[in-house]
């Protein structure tokens, strides 16, 4: 499920510069700013990885 806690994703930065706001006690959605085909798949995979991590934490 999605909550009011979202990743704040700056797609103009590199992966190592990504700034995330995450409440680890809840499954988080992603707010995508300036989406493009080149980064949508990466974001989906990252979201899935985080969801898995949260479920296993």
Swiss-Prot record:
Its EC number is 3.4.11.7. It is found in: Cell membrane. Its cofactor is Zn(2+). Keywords: Aminopeptidase, Calcium, Cell membrane, Disulfide bond, Glycoprotein, Hydrolase, Membrane, Metal-binding, Metalloprotease, Protease, Signal-anchor, Transmembrane, Transmembrane helix, Zinc. It is an enzyme of class 3 (hydrolase). Binds 1 zinc ion per subunit. Glycans are attached at residue 12. GO terms for biological process: proteolysis. One of its GO terms (cellular component) is plasma membrane. Residues 1-57 are extracellular. It catalyses: Release of N-terminal glutamate (and to a lesser extent aspartate) from a peptide. Its main location: membrane. Coiled coil: none annotated. The keyword Glycoprotein applies. Venom protein that cleaves N-terminal acidic residues from peptides with high potency in presence of calcium. It may have several roles in venom including alteration of blood pressure by cleaving circulating angiotensin-2, general degradation of host tissue, increase of permeability to other venom components, and/or processing of other toxins in the venom. Homodimer; disulfide-linked. Belongs to the peptidase M1 family. This is Aminopeptidase A. It comes from Gloydius blomhoffii (Mamushi).
């Amino acid at each position: 499920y999605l909550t009011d806690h979202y990743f704040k994703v700056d797609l103009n930065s590199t992966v190592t510069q990504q700034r995330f706001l995450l409440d680890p006690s809840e499954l988080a959605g992603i707010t995508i700013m300036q989406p493009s085909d080149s980064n949508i798949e990466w974001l989906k995979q990252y979201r899935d990885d985080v969801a898995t991590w949260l479920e296993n934490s």
